[in-house]
Amino acid sequence: IIDINFYENEEFLKNLKSRCHSCRNLMYEKIKRYALENGFDYICDGNNISDLVADRPGILITYGMEFNTPLIEAKLTSKEIHEYLEKNNIPYSRSTTCLATRIPTNTKITKDKIEKIKKSEKILSKISGCELVKVRNFNKVSVCEINNFSKIINNNSFNELNNQLKLVGYEKVCLNL
């Protein structure tokens, strides 16, 4: 494991439109340095074909640093990879975007905001029963996103969610339907 403290990186904290690019550049520079210092000849990136059509500005770093992309070369999509893993009972964690993406661009990133988002997403996941959740942070307003809101609406769980997220520090809790 390569240790990186993103809170020491001003480009990351500024949260400009180029944040993803700067962040990935920081990570990949450290990975490449480690690989060179330890005699690795081959560095692989886990991006797949689905990542090429998503809004992923940091993906250009992969090619700029000459990392190998075997899943893209094999033309595999996220869906195909997940189906293969499930079919073969290979444990994996569903990917989700960086928590910094929950903070609006040009709004300063702080450790407190990231911790608040992390805590809120654990609460949302527990109450909704959904594995993939997002809580977007708009200062005192949280915007919750999950793939199946019926679990919250049908079970009358919104009041519990509202109360729990207000304890975290939000004044208003919204569902993005």
Please place each PLM-identified region on the residue numbering.
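A short, flexible beta-alpha/helix-coil linker loop
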Residues: 7, 104-106, 149-150
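Peripheral terminal appendages
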Residues: 39, 112-177
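ATP-dependent adenylation/nucleotidyltransferase module used to activate substrates
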Residues: 1-87, 142, 156-171, 175
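Mid-to-C-terminal catalytic subdomains of enzymes
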Residues: 72-125, 129-132
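Short beta-strands and strand-loop turn motifs
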Residues: 45-46, 96-102, 144-145
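Proline- and acidic/polar-enriched loop/turn elements at helix boundaries
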Residues: 3-4, 47, 94-98, 137, ...
